[in-house]
Regions:
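Cysteine-dependent hydrolase recognition
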Residues: 1-307, 311-320, 328-330, 338-360, ...
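Short, acidic/polar linear motifs in exposed loop/turn regions
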Residues: 252-254, 325, 399-401, 451, ...
Length: 526
């Protein structure tokens, strides 16, 4: 489907189990930086496994937080997921950061990606006796990948490095706004002078429709004003707790405003990039006996994600900058995506000229937390009702100054299931403000494989002033082993002459076909 997820690009790197793995991590980082430079409208998410804490379990070393980060990012959506590292028929990385079971559990039916795995035997489709992780990812009826560029046999690291870097150039059409099909990008990669003499190029295949292209939107969306000043010349800095008004227009590639363009814009404002580092989980050292670490820049936190109407090619939106921005002044990023109402046209844009930092010392006071309304699966749900084992949380929010998504310490939008504070669900990335109204917003979050029975879900949110509110909802996950039961059957009006309505409760989470028969007191069917 259409949506701002089409501006997202995701890379995942293996950790460093041995010294020679260092180049895998560094290559992934190099590709990420190349993508940022060549396609600055893309929001590049880096998941370097070694920047997360590794856990030791009875089954071996694991990265549960990496697994969750991959799941969440895939369900939020990305046009490409590029994994570089070790892998095999059962998944990627020896720590099983995304395994064959995960490939079947993924639930992203409207945000299908191109999954790139230059690794060993991930999609060994030529063995009918053994189904592999890549095949399950492609077959996934709830989503998965719409296309894969993947391997059927073991591939050497040096070949993988050159192949991955070369592939990115063609897949994203560096230097051009004209995209080619995914399969054509692979063909050109294999015929590139860097790769054409490598026999192992024959181990990499395209799975999917050979005519399919990446869903990259057309250029361009441009920011023209910040707080009524021209964006190109303004010296304004967006301070914490200060109001912001951003104006712009949707144009063609030549910069002409599309005066007949009417639709909806999604704007995502990022704080300054964050400096991060890997942590050397496996204690692997280089030839100088120093722990192998890698510094890298990651996207800043989202300080606002909202929507605005586009009318005759023009748009404007407002918000209050959260208290939790990093105070030091620097350039953030505005990421823009819009969809035209009457056609299949969508556009994208970006701007790095916005400066963020400092604090508005004259901000009005606010001591009231946001209002939260919770539902499960649909907004007709009443607390205590029945759901399936994979329910979707729906949450609506309201606050006079807007909801905080800037991820200050302890200030995330969170959900806690059954009081388990060791397993907190962070929901910031799922929140979007309403169209033309930064005070209202909503999110939906899919839960997976919940146990049958009664559950209590607690959602906590903060406004941009860091006032918090919590709200609970209870729901009963239907036990598939139970027989169907109907209770509280009633009708109104009763008695009736020619019309009545029936209500009843049932213990099924499925859509039901209901047959009603009405008899007279003498037993005659009406």
């Amino acid at each position: 489907t259409y949506g701002s997820w089409r501006n997202n690009f995701m890379l995942v790197s293996d950790d460093i189990d041995k010294r020679s793995d260092r180049i895998i991590q560094e290559t992934t980082e190099d590709i990420a930086e190349d993508v940022k430079a060549e396609k600055p409208f893309l929001n590049v998410l880096k998941i370097h496994a070694d920047s997360f804490v590794q856990e030791t379990t009875s089954g071996g070393d694991r990265y549960s937080l990496v697994n969750k980060a991959i799941f969440d990012a895939l369900e939020v959506g990305a046009i490409v997921v590029n994994y570089f590292g070790h892998g095999g028929e059962n998944g990627i990385a020896s720590e099983r950061i995304f395994d064959i079971i995960n490939a079947q559990e993924l639930n992203n039916p409207t945000k299908l990606n191109c999954f790139v795995t230059v690794t060993c035997e991930y999609t060994k489709f030529d063995n009918p006796l053994r189904e592999t992780a890549g095949e399950f990812l492609f077959w996934n009826k709830k989503g998965g990948a719409i296309s894969l560029i993947t391997t059927t046999r073991r591939i050497y690291v040096n070949v993988g490095i050159n192949f991955n870097k070369t592939l990115s150039q063609y897949l994203l059409s560096y230097g051009s706004d004209e995209t080619i099909s995914i399969a054509e990008a692979l063909r050109r990669t294999k015929n590139d002078p860097m790769i054409s003499n490598q026999p192992q190029r024959r181990l990499v295949f395209s799975i999917g429709d050979p005519a399919l292209k990446l869903p990259i939107a057309d250029p361009d969306i441009r920011i023209t004003k910040l707080n009524n000043e021209a964006i190109a010349s303004t010296t304004l800095v967006l301070n914490a707790l200060s109001p912001a008004k951003i104006e712009g227009n949707v144009t063609n590639a030549q910069g002409a405003v599309l005066n007949n363009y009417n639709g909806v814009l999604t704007a995502t404002i990022y704080d300054k990039d964050v400096e991060r580092s890997t942590i050397g989980n496996d204690g692997t050292k280089d030839s100088n006996n120093e722990l192998i670490l890698m510094d890298f820049d990651a996207l800043g936190e989202v300080i606002f994600r909202g929507q605005a109407s586009v009318t005759n090619g023009e748009f404007a939106f407002e918000f209050i900058v959260p208290r939790d921005i990093t105070v030091a002044e620097g350039n953030g990023k505005i990421s823009l995506y819009s969809k035209e109402n009457a056609t299949l046209l969508d556009n994208r844009g970006y701007n790095y000229n916005i400066k963020i930092g400092g604090v508005n010392l004259n901000a009005p006071e606010d001591t009231i937390g946001p209002t939260i309304n919770l539902f499960m699966n649909d907004e007709n749900f009443v607390s205590g009702g029945i759901t399936n084992e994979n329910p979707t949380l729906l949450a609506n929010f309201y606050d006079e100054n807007g909801i905080n998504t800037a991820s200050g310490i302890g200030h995330d939008i969170t959900a806690i299931l059954d009081g388990d504070e060791t397993n907190v669900f962070r929901l910031n990335d799922y929140y979007t403000a309403a169209i033309d109204d930064y005070k209202r917003g909503s999110l939906s979050y899919p839960f997976r494989d919940l146990s049958p029975g009664l559950h209590t879900l607690t959602v906590k949110a903060w406004d941009v002033y860091n006032n918090s509110s919590t709200q609970d909802i209870q729901f009963i996950v239907f036990d598939k082993d139970e027989s169907l039961e109907l209770t509280n059957v009633l009708n109104y009006p009763n008695p009736f002459i020619n019309y009545t309505e029936f209500w009843f409760s049932h213990n099924s989470s499925d859509v039901l076909d209901v047959s009603i028969q009405i008899f007279t007191i003498s037993g005659k069917l009406i």
